[in-house]
Amino acid sequence: EQTPGDLNRIYFTTGGSTAVDSALRLCQLANNIKGARNKKQIITREKAYHGSTYLSASVTGKERDKTAMDIKREGIHFLKAPCHFYYPEFDNEDDFCDFLINELEEKIIEIGPENIMAFIAEPILASGGVIVPPKNYNYRCWEVVKRYNIIYIADEVVTAFCRLGYWFASEHVFGIIPDIIIFAKGITSGYCLLYTSPSPRDGDE
């Protein structure tokens, strides 16, 4: 009832990192089934944090969060972080936003949309410094990505469950309907979701 658009199926995982891995694997599965086996490239962003498992660490844009263990580098493309503070050469946020959108579209054209599996983005880059992107940035990215028939993954591990005033920020705050939405943490109010069901006989004895 609360998920954006027609997102009406849930796949449970063990945490946010594995949720990201699962989302990317589902993209691979869908493309392979459709015969689009060349669509393997992933676009992400600098300063983004998507997790610590193999694939989620690979699409994370924070080098200090990447351990000495191997990660996947081939086929992962990083765009600039949507933080105006890092790029003072732009006089205003609107010009900076235009630059970021152009960068995204140029990267898609460079790689070839027929080769791109997904674009993954946090609506607000939390671990990267609580980076709030320029106004309309998320919506404009979504427009570009959908124009080129690329899967849009919204990583709402941090922003979902009313962190920004709504169950999910993608639709109500940023006006986008992602193809896949990832959430964790807030779904259990921060409690670790674990369960054991012992036999009543154990208690009786």
Language model segments and positions:
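Conserved active-site segment immediately N-terminal to the catalytic lysine
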Residues: 169-185
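Active-site nucleophile and cofactor-binding loops and adjacent substrate-binding regions
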Residues: 10-20, 158, 182-188
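PLP-dependent aspartate aminotransferase-fold enzymes
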Residues: 2-117
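Acidic-glycine-rich active-site phosphate/pyrophosphate-binding loop
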Residues: 1, 170, 197
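Generic enzyme active-site microenvironment
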Residues: 23, 120, 153-154, 177, ...
